[in-house]
Amino acid sequence: MDEAEASLLRHFPLLLPQNREKTVYEGFISAQGSDFHLRIVLPKDLQLKKARLLCSLQLKNILNEYHQVVQQRMKHSPDLMSFMMELKMILEVALKNKQELCVQPPSCSFCKDLLTEIGAIGWDKLACVESSFSTIKLKADDASGRKHLITVKLKAKYPVEPPDCVVDFPVPFSVSWTPQSSLVDVYSQFLVALETLKVFWDVMDEIDEKTWVLEPEKPPRSATARRIALGKNVSIAIEVDPRHPTMLPEFCFLGADHVTKPLGMKLSGSIHLWDPENSLLQNLKDVLEIDFPARSILEESDFSMDCGICYARHLNGAIPDQVCNNPQCGQPFHEICLYEWLRGLSTSRQSFNVFFGDCPYCSKPITLKMSGRKP
């Protein structure tokens, strides 16, 4: 017995040769705990290209939608062992898909209990329910009138097993659960969480409404970061703590050094003025001694956020965050665009993760310090 035959017997012990030439194999293939009868007839040269696969009616029905895939794999498999491994993989996928389509409908008592729980919450709070009753979406308004959704995914052993809950929160949301708990308990905890996050969302909404937020363009409720335009090619990136939203956030200024350095010095010198009783935006105005310009005002000026190399604002989800330090230029660039530009110049040089070269716009010296992101 050669190595190929031994491997076939080891992986498929129920499939045996029916003649000395080993051109006919018959037996069973196992998948998902079941055995399926099949017969494979090979030509004299044992090439799979001209082989025939004969299946039991049960196996034929399961593989019906995968007929072309099976034929293709048979045609391209180098030997019987390779084909059988691929056939088993296809069979596993087919059985899994069939099981998902044949999920048992919920019992009448399960549906009745679930409807009672939804009624206790209030039918006006129901946003959506799947026909299988496995996924339920509930809605709520917070104290500021913002609308929120919670998606509750019930498991097979509900209520013994806790459901999975999906929310658009900036912090983890875990449900306290016992076998006696219900949707009412989930919804109550959801409302409590909304109340604890009210101040955070108030802070973020004020920033979104009263400043020009460069990133993200359409922030979800879970977003804790904002990049805010301060003027021509200068911005501030902040990361807000959802649990302490009026405290000093993590921040960094983005732009040319001659603009960002004075702002950094001003903030450092006025940090003692930060008052957690005020909103985050008001505190930023006080310590920076500026009024955040509205988008309409900046767009009417010569403010530009397009990259000076690719001429686009967004590239792979990022906006330009590198700026020429020449006060007469100040052209913004995407990091990856500037990296590729400098790398292509024979006159540029590199020291560790810092590149030195000439600005594509004004030809003055420009420096690029690569971030941790891969270009």
Curated annotation (Swiss-Prot):
The RING-type zinc finger domain is monoubiquitinated in the presence of UBE2T and UBE2W. It is an enzyme of class 2 (transferase). Signal peptide: none annotated. Its EC number is 2.3.2.27. The keyword Cell division does not apply. GO terms for molecular function: ubiquitin protein ligase activity; ubiquitin protein ligase binding; ubiquitin-protein transferase activity; zinc ion binding. The UBC-RWD region (URD) region mediates interaction with FANCI and FANCD2. It is linked to Defects in Fancl are a cause of the gcd (germ cell deficient) mutant phenotype, which leads to reduced numbers of precursor germ cells and adult sterility, probably due to a reduced precursor germ cells proliferation. This is E3 ubiquitin-protein ligase FANCL. It comes from Mus musculus (Mouse). The lineage of its organism: Eukaryota, Metazoa, Chordata, Craniata, Vertebrata. The gene is Fancl.
